A protein has these predicted regions:
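Basic, Lys/Arg-enriched alpha-helical interface segments
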Residues: 1-93
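Enriched for short, Lys/Arg-rich terminal
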Residues: 2-4, 84-126
Length: 126
């Protein structure tokens, strides 16, 4: 019996920017609540410790992402740039709820690409 193939998990620059934006947002709330950044720090811990091994072993674990070009101008531009890549690589947009945050990722036959993150109460990805 052979071991299932584990796909490489690649964090895109957009994903890193989304995490930075979440950290900045929660850091800006510290004056309201001293523990404001704990959720974002927990997300970083989960991303670094659990997310990559989980998606490498089970890349289809997330639900199909419901992306809409009506969400916002930045989302629309991003989806328009992504469309040609999706057609060639046969990428599947999926999302996984990790703690309080949705992780947007794309699965291809050869890799998993972490694309963005948002709090579960946010309407669109960063």
């Amino acid at each position: 019996m052979s071991t299932p193939r584990r796909l490489p998990v690649v964090a895109t620059r957009r994903f890193e920017r989304a995490l930075d934006a979440l950290l900045d947002h929660y850091d800006g709330l510290r004056h309201l609540h001293p523990d404001a950044g704990s959720r974002a720090l927990r997300l970083i811990d989960l991303v670094e410790g659990e997310l990559a091994p989980l998606l490498a072993a089970q890349p289809d674990i997330g639900r199909p992402a419901q992306l809409s070009v009506n969400q916002g101008e930045t989302e629309k531009n991003w989806l328009n740039r992504l469309a040609p890549l999706t057609a060639r690589r046969r990428l599947q947009a999926r999302e996984w709820l990790l703690g309080d945050f949705w992780i947007l990722y794309y699965r291809s036959a050869s890799a998993v690409y972490l694309a963005s993150a948002r709090h579960e109460r946010e309407a669109e990805y960063r």
